[in-house]
From Swiss-Prot:
Substrate binds at R116, N169, Y170, R297, C298, T299, R451. The modification N-acetylalanine is found at A2. The record marks N169 as: Transition state stabilizer. NADP(+) binds at K192, T195, D230, E391. This is NADP-dependent glyceraldehyde-3-phosphate dehydrogenase. It catalyses: D-glyceraldehyde 3-phosphate + NADP(+) + H2O = (2R)-3-phosphoglycerate + NADPH + 2 H(+). It is an enzyme of class 1 (oxidoreductase). PANTHER family: ALDEHYDE DEHYDROGENASE. GO terms for molecular function: glyceraldehyde-3-phosphate dehydrogenase (NADP+) (non-phosphorylating) activity. One of its GO terms (cellular component) is cytoplasm. Belongs to the aldehyde dehydrogenase family. NAD(+) binds at G245, G246, D247, T248, G249. Its main location: cytoplasm.
Length: 496
């Protein structure tokens, strides 16, 4: 169970502790933040409400610990990461249980997230040794007008303190995707987990603690965003911010100052379906892409743009598959579970009601019980409906019928988002041309949008983000180039 056995020390009565200076601590505030179970809508867990003074203390510890960590050999950093990954995977059950209870993720998917996270840590350790173990050597005479009198040595050095802010929907995986690159690169790491997902993150951090990382190198601060959010993101000790979430990231980017930012802020991922597409394949991918984890994924299929000539057939195929989706508790591995909060459910309902008022065709009856919304396919959606543009983050998929490929591309590109998209066709030449025309960070051909495998580049255009994720890109973003130039008194040529 969560907070027991190996993880007993992270819990103080009913309240989970925060992590700083290699210890689990209670906040001087004497206050806690409640975490609601989305399915029961009752308090499931409580975490510490940390203060700004505690944030300051954590930042000072992080700055100090980073200096010595930067001098730790790469192989030793990698060794500790491999150890943390093994502990994480060996103790997946408590974290998976927490994911089920605090974000209503189906049990089997919760286990998968933890195992995937362990694999990501190990991969990052190996990739970091390769990337950071190589330098670069330049000679001055390759540039016109120069003799070979200068030798340039370049290497990658850490940035300092990295602030990691993962989202509720993948709190463990999208935390370690920031933590592991930061640590292998020689940085220290301060984690601010989401409220929904915080307990899963605290269990994950304990795995790093058990692996034996130096005190102060990793910290995990919990609390109310209204009290410590801006204080964290604007803290002068922070040298890099890696954030995944909603449009809060836009506000963070405006306030952060001159530091590297890695931001993934959501999307309105379009699925363009041509008239030659394999419609059975398309239907399966709409179900997988649009309804898995109740549509609460940044890479979910958010709008289907299908050629009119095949729209009727596709809609019927998707309707048949929607009818087979199970709805219920995450403990029972239901396909559709409660969305994360009442406010999220209300927002989704607002989009649905707007579509209803404006004449969309409901392929199923709209049904909601608390935070649980039954899967819904909306046909004949028009561009004047909110659901055509806004991100529902729920189990609702709108279908817009188009009369040309250009119409589909134009709708995709008119969005303020640009995370991912997909195109279904048997003509690879058309697929490549459409991919090039779509203003998104990634285009999937004949598959639903997806983040991963975790070493693939993952980035958004426009309001969907800044920078690129993926193991290699994250390591590079969390380092800077250091150059040393050797000046020779006379030109020197090998074998000259």
């Amino acid at each position: 169970m969560a907070g027991t056995g190996l993880f007993a020390e992270i819990l103080d009565g009913e309240v989970y502790k925060y992590y700083a200076d290699g210890e689990w601590k209670t906040s001087s505030s004497g206050k806690s933040v409640a975490i609601m179970n989305p399915a029961t809508r009752k308090t499931q867990y409580k975490v510490q409400a940390c203060t700004q003074e505690e944030v300051n203390a954590v930042m000072e510890l992080a700055k100090s610990a980073q200096k010595s960590w930067a001098k730790t050999p790469l192989w030793k950093r990698a060794e500790l990461l491999h150890k943390a990954a093994a502990i994480l995977k060996d103790n997946k059950a408590p974290m998976a249980e927490s994911l089920v209870k605090e974000i209503a993720k189906p049990a089997k998917d919760s286990v998968t997230e933890v195992v995937r996270s362990g694999d990501l840590i190990s991969y990052c350790a190996e990739e970091g040794v390769r990337i950071l173990g190589e330098g670069k050597f330049l000679l001055s005479d390759s540039f016109p007008g120069n003799d070979r009198t200068k030798y340039c040595l370049t290497s990658k050095i850490p940035l300092g303190v990295v602030l990691a802010i993962p989202p509720f929907n993948y709190p463990v995986n999208l935390a370690v995707s920031k933590i592991a690159p930061a640590l292998i690169a020689g940085n220290s790491l301060v984690l601010k987990p989401p409220t929904q997902g915080a307990v899963s993150c605290l269990h994950m951090v304990h795995c790093f603690h058990l692996a034996g990382f130096p005190k102060g190198l990793i910290s995990c601060i919990t609390g109310k965003g209204s009290e410590i959010g801006d204080f964290l993101t604007m803290h002068p000790a922070v040298n890099c911010i890696s954030f995944t979430g909603g449009d809060t990231g836009i506000s963070i980017s405006k306030k952060a100052g001159m530091i590297p930012l890695q931001m993934e802020l959501g999307g309105k991922d379009a699925c363009i379906v041509l008239d030659d597409a394999d419609l059975d394949l398309v239907a399966s991918n709409i179900i997988k892409g649009g309804f898995s984890y109740s549509g609460q994924r940044c890479t979910a299929v958010k709008v289907v743009l299908v050629m009119e000539s095949v729209a009727d057939e596709l809609v019927e195929k998707v309707k048949a598959k929607v009818a087979k989706l199970t709805v219920g508790p995450p403990e029972e591995n239901s396909d559709i579970t409660a969305v994360v909060s009442e406010s999220s459910a209300n927002f989704i309902e607002g989009l649905v009601m707007d579509a209803k008022e404006k004449g969309a065709t409901f392929c199923q009856e709209y049904k909601r019980e608390g935070n649980l919304i039954w899967p819904l396919l909306l046909d004949n959606v028009r561009p004047d409906m909110r659901i055509a543009w806004e991100e529902p983050f729920g189990p609702v998929v709108p279908v817009l019928r188009i009369n040309s490929v250009e119409e589909g591309i134009n709708h995709c590109n008119a969005s303020n988002f640009g995370l991912q998209g997909c195109v279904f066709t048997k003509d690879i030449n058309k697929a490549i041309l459409i991919s090039d025309a779509m203003e998104t960070g990634t285009v999937q051909i004949n598959s639903a949008p997806a983040r991963g495998p975790d070493h693939f580049p993952f980035q958004g255009l426009k309001d969907s983000g800044i920078g690129s994720q993926g193991v290699t890109n994250s390591i590079n973003l969390m380092t800077k180039v250091k150059t040393t130039v050797i000046n020779l008194p006379t030109p020197s040529y090998s074998m000259g």
